[in-house]
Amino acid sequence: MNVVVVGATGRTGSEIVAEASERGHDVSGVARSQTSVGDVRVYPTEEFPELLDNADAVIDFTVPEATREHVQAAAAAGVPYVIGTTGFDDDGMAALRTASESTAVLKASNFARGVQALLRVVEAGVEALPEYDIELTETHHNGKRDAPSGTANTILDVVDETRDEALDRTHGREGEHRRGDDEVGVHVRRAGTVRGEHELLLAGNDEVLSLTHRAESRRVFAAGAVDAAEWLADRSAGWYDFEDTV
């Protein structure tokens, strides 16, 4: 399979290049300027449309502005597109949805298999303990731009869907006020080189249930992204998420 990795020189992008190469795929990279990642050639952004001529799938872990531009080109060429970029506004998400009308687009906030399991456990826990207070803490490296993380927002969406109501999301706390009954606390930490950690706390009278996922390496995200690309390559135009591949 011919795979184009957009953001090939980034933290996760370079891991995706390595993972896809080790699986025997033909890999080309895209970045701001021409370079290489190991034995894989990385082309400047302006050459991306030409790479689509022979591509079976694109994997993109960059920033919303770049992803939006590249997915439009891929849609025009009919090349399936895997998106790990987070932090899109409503207009950005609408653009991705529009692209999915012309090609297969798979977007996920997290490509770790363990996170998919966590989401199912979160649903079960929230359903079983409907009166418990809920707090979410997420930690990432000091270079991560969006907060809360895309994974944190996905977890919170699962909580809302399971509770069948939109809880008030309180981002951090200060001052003096009582915790609301329909409130979920959201706490963000950015420090060092932490790959990603998410903890959902369900607290009742005299007991606490803590649900945690911790990524030990970015390779887990890379493996999931390549899994997604392999699965997506033969799909028809439409909108998909990582859960569809499980």
Curated annotation (Swiss-Prot):
Q: Which reaction does it catalyse?
A: (S)-2,3,4,5-tetrahydrodipicolinate + NAD(+) + H2O = (2S,4S)-4-hydroxy-2,3,4,5-tetrahydrodipicolinate + NADH + H(+); (S)-2,3,4,5-tetrahydrodipicolinate + NADP(+) + H2O = (2S,4S)-4-hydroxy-2,3,4,5-tetrahydrodipicolinate + NADPH + H(+)
Q: Indicate yes or no for the key word NADP.
A: yes
Give the UniProt family note: Belongs to the DapB family.
Molecular function, one GO term: NAD binding
Q: Which InterPro entries match?
A: DapB_C, DapB_N, DapB_N_CS, DHDPR_bac, NAD(P)-bd_dom_sf
Record carries keyword Ion transport: no
What residues sit in the active site?
H140, K144
The UniProt function text for this chain reads: Catalyzes the conversion of 4-hydroxy-tetrahydrodipicolinate (HTPA) to tetrahydrodipicolinate.
- Provide GO CC annotations from the record: cytoplasm
The domain of life is: Archaea
Per UniProt, the keywords (alphabetical) are: Amino-acid biosynthesis, Cytoplasm, Diaminopimelate biosynthesis, Lysine biosynthesis, NAD, NADP, Oxidoreductase
Task: List the pathway annotation.
Answer: Amino-acid biosynthesis; L-lysine biosynthesis via DAP pathway; (S)-tetrahydrodipicolinate from L-aspartate: step 4/4
Chain residues that bind NAD(+): G7, A8, T9, G10, R11, T12, G84, T85, T86, A108, S109, N110, F111
EC identifiers of the protein:
1.17.1.8
Q: In its UniProt entry, what is this protein called?
A: 4-hydroxy-tetrahydrodipicolinate reductase
